[in-house]
Amino acid sequence: MGKTVAIVKQKGGVGKTTTAVNLAAAVGMKGYKTLLVDIDPQGNATSGLGFNKRDTGLSTYDMIIGQAPAEEILKETKFSRLDLLPANMALAGAEIEVADLDFREARIKNALAPLKEKYDFIFLDCPPSLGLITINALCAVDSVLVPIQCEFYALEGLSQLMNTVRQVKRKYNPLIDIEGVLLTMFDGRLNLTQQVVSEVKRFFPQKVFSVVIPRNVRLSEAPSFGQPVAYYDRASKGSRAYDELADEFLKKNGKTPLSHF
């Protein structure tokens, strides 16, 4: 039974999709069959894996509203052991439609259930909001990974996010847990960065990944080439950071790399 992890932050520009794409790719490279589920209407995880988000055909929108099973939407990527459930702009209207459907909080959970036996890890790239689609994701997953940028206002909205996770845990998904908090856009030369690190560790004791994701131009460039950074520039700082994050993530889950890229 594969583990499901939602990558969530209700604020854009924090490295959410970058983390979803590159962590999923790195885990696949280490020998584990991995699925990335793009449920962000912007579809940047979809394009970041080399697909045209304007021409995906069926998408996670169809899966969520019940027009097509997940198996029909599934796409193999050209990257090692990594598959994708793509998104497109149709998702932008899904919140309104889902609100009127039966079992509205469990649409994603029920849709992904047949795939959990086929994958070791399933990562969900959530919308940058705490709407009904994100609530659906939280109801469907085992854990939540929260990226936080090392910048001013880094903790903005975190209390609201944690409150939402607690409500979902109480009402719908009692087993959900915090997988970890990931510090992104890290620049150790800045005093502000050190202040943010201290604040985050105080807010999330024992939950902050030891690996940090640095500011890195290759991380910014890779999506425009439709590639995870490890395939775009294996030697870059960004690639090495996500490689190390995958190792730490696997260790937390009692796993070791089965192969090396």
Regions found by a protein language model. Give the residues of each.
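P-loop NTP-binding core
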Residues: 1-261
